[in-house]
Amino acid sequence: NLMQFELLIMKVAGRSGIVWYSD
C-alpha cells in the first residue's frame, strides 16, 4: 500500500531527525 509506504518514510525520516519528505 502506497499510503503505508509514505508513513514508513515519514517514520524513518522523523527517527533520523531528517525532514526531506514533503508532499
UniProtKB/Swiss-Prot annotation:
EC identifiers of the protein: 3.1.1.4
Disulfide bridge map: none
Catalytic activity: a 1,2-diacyl-sn-glycero-3-phosphocholine + H2O = a 1-acyl-sn-glycero-3-phosphocholine + a fatty acid + H(+)
GO terms under cellular component: extracellular region
Keywords: Calcium, Disulfide bond, Hemostasis impairing toxin, Hydrolase, Lipid degradation, Lipid metabolism, Metal-binding, Platelet aggregation inhibiting toxin, Secreted, Toxin
GO terms for MF: metal ion binding; phospholipase A2 activity; toxin activity
Requisite cofactors: Ca(2+)
Originating species: Trimeresurus stejnegeri
Cofactor binding annotation: Binds 1 Ca(2+) ion.
Role according to the record: Snake venom phospholipase A2 (PLA2) that shows a moderate inhibition of ADP-induced human platelet aggregation when tested on platelet rich plasma. Exhibits moderate hydrolytic activities and prefers the anionic micelles (dPPC with deoxycholate) to the zwitterionic micelles (dPPC with Triton X-100). PLA2 catalyzes the calcium-dependent hydrolysis of the 2-acyl groups in 3-sn-phosphoglycerides.
Gene Ontology biological process: lipid catabolic process
Post-translational events: Contains 7 disulfide bonds.
Localization: Secreted
Official protein name in the record: Acidic phospholipase A2 CTs-A2
Expression across tissues: Expressed by the venom gland.
Chief localisation class: secreted
Family: Belongs to the phospholipase A2 family. Group II subfamily.
